Amino acid sequence: MNCNVLFLLSVLVSVTAGVTAAYHPTDVFLFNCGDTSNNVDNSGRNWTVESRQILSSNLVNASFTSEASYQKAGVSRIPYMKARIFRSEFTYSFPVTPGSIFLRLYFYPTQYKSGFDAVNSFFSVKVNGFTLLRNFNADSTVQASIPLSNSLIKEFIIPVHQTLNLTFTPSKNLLAFVNGIEIVSMPDRFYSKGGFDNVLRNVSSDVDFQIDNSTAFESVHRLNVGGQIVNEVDDSGMFRRWLSDDSFGNSGSIVNVPGVKINYTEKTPAYVAPYDVYATSRLMGNSSNLMFNLTGMFLTVDAGYNYLVRLHFCETLPQVTKAGQRVFSIFVEDKMAKKETDVIRLSGGPRIPMYLDFSVYVGFESGMIQPELRLDLVPLKDTNQTYYDAILSGVEILKLNDSDGNLARPNPELLVSTDSTPDDSNVTPPIKGKPHVLVIILIVVGSVIGLATFIVIIMLLIRQMKRKKNKKENSVIMFKLLLKQYIYAELKKITKSFSHTVGKGGFGTVYRGNLSNGRTVAVKVLKDLKGNGDDFINEVTSMSQTSHVNIVSLLGFCYEGSKRAIISEFLEHGSLDQFISRNKSLTPNVTTLYGIALGIARGLEYLHYGCKTRIVHFDIKPQNILLDDNFCPKVADFGLAKLCEKRESILSLIDTRGTIGYIAPEVVSRMYGGISHKSDVYSYGMLVLDMIGARNKVETTTCNGSTAYFPDWIYKDLENGDQTWIIGDEINEEDNKIVKKMILVSLWCIRPCPSDRPPMNKVVEMIEGSLDALELPPKPSRHISTELVLESSSLSDGQEAEKQTQTLDSTII
C-alpha cells in the first residue's frame, strides 16, 4: 500500500515538474565564428571557437577571419566583433540529435580590419536542402529592421536527422560572412502540432491546416505584447528573444499585475512561453470596462508564403475570473480565424495560459513583395459580457518553406549575378582600346534602370487607384465580419414598412422598429442619392469602432444595391433638442442638465482619446445627442465624422462639415486657424449654451433689433449677477454655481482661435472640478458673416437652415 502511494506521489511530482519547469535542450551549440578563444557574452552564455571537425576541408582557401574596425552602439563584443569571411562556397557540418532545432545566424554588417566591407556582401545560405537566404544583404536588412538595430539575428527552425549541413555561397565576385552560429534543440513538433488544443486553424478554409515533420520555418516576429524585451537567457529554455510590441503602433492599455502567479498546465507547459510573456498583456481598448476599440496590428512579412500565427493569452486581472466576462473574435488578414475566444473558458480559469495557432497564406494581391499581415481582436457585441474588450499576451509569426524548400524572399532587382561561384580564372579582364563597349554597357544599364523606374511608378499609381476603388468594398466586407447585416426586406419587416418615423435629417430618415427578439431599435435609412455611400462608410466605420456608455451602440447595417441603412439602439427620451424644447417653459433640473453636459463631454473625450484611431464628429448639436431612460446622453449620427491618427494636429477637409450655429469658425474659414478635434470642442460649447438657455436669449435679442454680440452680454450679465434668463427665480445657490460653471466652460470652448480652446479631456476636468478653479476667459471680438457660412456650409440637417440663419451673426464666433 505504502509503495503504491509513494509511486503515485512520484508520478504526480514528475508530471507537475514537467508542467512548471523550463525546457532543457539536448543540444546547445554557440560558435563565435572567426575567434581564436572561447568567450562569455554579456548574458553569461559561453561561446566556443569553431571546431575543425565541423569545418570544410578547404578551410584556408575558402575563408579567412577578421575583426570589426569599430563597435557600434548596441552591438555586443561577443559574438559580433569577429567574423568568418568566405571567398567561395563553404560548408559547416554539425552532429545533432534527430528532431527539429533552432538555427540562429548572427550578422554585423560593418567594415572589418582586413578591408572587407560587409555592407557590400551578398550571399546565399542553404541547410539540408532548404534555401534560407538568397542574394542576402545583411546591411539592407538591418537598415529596415524594427526596432532599429546595428546587428541582426536570423532565426530558422530546421528538421534534422543526425547531421546539419550549413552552406554559405557568396554571390559572384563578392564575399560572404557570418559572426555567430547558434544551434538549440526544441520539444518534439513544438511548432507543427497546433496550439494548446492541438489544432492548427486554417483561416481560409474549414479544414484544419497540417504541418508535417519535414517543414522548415523562419521566425519573422516574436512579440511580448504589453511587456518589455525578454532576452534569450530569460526565455523558457530555448533562448528565444521576445521583442516589445511598442514599436508596432499598439496603444491599448497594459495589464501588469505585480507578482501574479501563472498556473502552467499540461496543455500549456512552462516552456511554451516565459513568465514575462503571460504575466503582461495588452487590452485592445483603453479601459477594462465598457470600452471597445477595433485594433489592427500590422506585421511586415514576405509575400508568397504560408505563415503560422501563434497567439498567447492569459487572463491575469483579478476581476476577470469567470467564463463569459470577456469574449472576442480573432481576425487574421481580415478573415474570421476564431469567432468566440473566451480565455477563461478555453484555458480553464484565471491566470492559466493558453495559445492558439492559425495558418494563413499571404499572396501578392497588394502588389508588394513585403506586405503587412493584419491581426485584429474584436470584442463580441451581441453577448452579455462584462468587459467589452480583447486581450493579448504574445504573438509569434513563422514563415513556412514553399514547395521548393525555399524560405528566401524573391530576388530583388540588383545588378549582381548569383548564378555561379566566384573564381579568378572566370573573371573577364577589361577590354583595352574599345571604349565604345563601356559606353554601350552604360547606355544599356541606364535604359534598364529607367525602364524599371517607370514600371515601378506605373505599378504604384495603379495600386493607388485600385486601393481607392476598393476602399468602400473592403470596408463593407469588414463590416459584414463584425456586424449583423440585414437585407432591405428585413428592414421593412422590422419597421412595419417604415410606418413610425422618429426624425428626419439631411442624410436620411430615422424609423422606430423591433427586432425578432423584441428589442426596440432605431433604423436610419440614408437617402438614395449619389455620393451617400461615403456618408454611410463614415458612419459605420466610426460607430463600429466604439463602445462607450455615452456613444450610441451600432447593432447592424444594410448594404443592398443603392439601399443603405444603419440599425442602432433606440432611446426612449429622444434627442436633447426635443428635451430642451419640452422644458423651455419650465424651470430646468440643473442636476439633470449638468449630468447630460458631463456625459456628452465624456463621450467626446472617448472619441478623441479613447479610440486607437481618433474620431472627430464634426456635427455635435442637440439633435445628435440622444437620451436614455435615465437621461444618460449618447452621441449619435456619425455621418460627417472623420477618422484620423492621434498625432495629426491639423486635419484636411475638402468640404465644410456641420450645422449652422454649431460649426467652428475654422471649418468655415481657414483665417481662424487649422481644423482639428478642437472643432468638436467649439460645437460642444455652443451645445451647452443651448442647454442652459443662452441661445434663446440670442434669438430674442436679435429679433428686438439689437446687434449685441452674445458673449458680450453674457459677460455683462455675469458681472451684474443677472442669470434669470437661464435659471429663473427658483434656483438655489448650489445650482447657481453649477450653471455658472457650465457657462464658463462653454465660453472657453467657443474661443475663436482653436489653440485657445481646451481639449476634451481638459473640458471634462473643468466640468468635474471646482468653480473656484475657473476663470472668465478674455472677451472674443471676431465675427463671421452669415453669407460666408451659407456659401460654404454643407448642412447636416437642412430643415434648420432658416432658423439658424436668423441668429448667425450672434451665434458664430
Swiss-Prot record:
Record domain Protein kinase: where: 496-771
Subcellular location: Membrane
Cytoplasmic topological intervals: 459-813
Short name of one Pfam family: Malectin_like
E.C. designation(s): 2.7.11.-
Record-linked InterPro entries: Kinase-like_dom_sf (IPR011009), LRK10/LRL21-25-like (IPR045874), Malectin-like_Carb-bd_dom (IPR024788), Prot_kinase_dom (IPR000719), Protein_kinase_ATP_BS (IPR017441), Ser/Thr_kinase_AS (IPR008271)
Binding sites annotated in the UniProt record for ATP: 502-510, 524
Keywords: ATP-binding, Glycoprotein, Kinase, Membrane, Nucleotide-binding, Serine/threonine-protein kinase, Signal, Transferase, Transmembrane, Transmembrane helix
Main location group: membrane
Molecular function (Gene Ontology), one example: ATP binding
Statement: the UniProt record of this protein carries the keyword Acetylation: no
Lineage: superkingdom: Eukaryota
Stretches of the chain found on the membrane's Extracellular side: 22-437
Topology in the lipid bilayer: Single-pass type I membrane protein
Catalytic-site annotation from UniProt: 619 (proton acceptor)
Compositionally biased region (Polar residues): 804-813
Range of residues in the leader sequence: 1-21
Bilayer-spanning residue ranges: 438-458
Family: Belongs to the protein kinase superfamily. Ser/Thr protein kinase family.
Name of the protein described by the UniProt record: Probable receptor-like protein kinase At5g39020
Organism: Arabidopsis thaliana
Upper lineage: Eukaryota, Viridiplantae, Streptophyta, Embryophyta, Tracheophyta
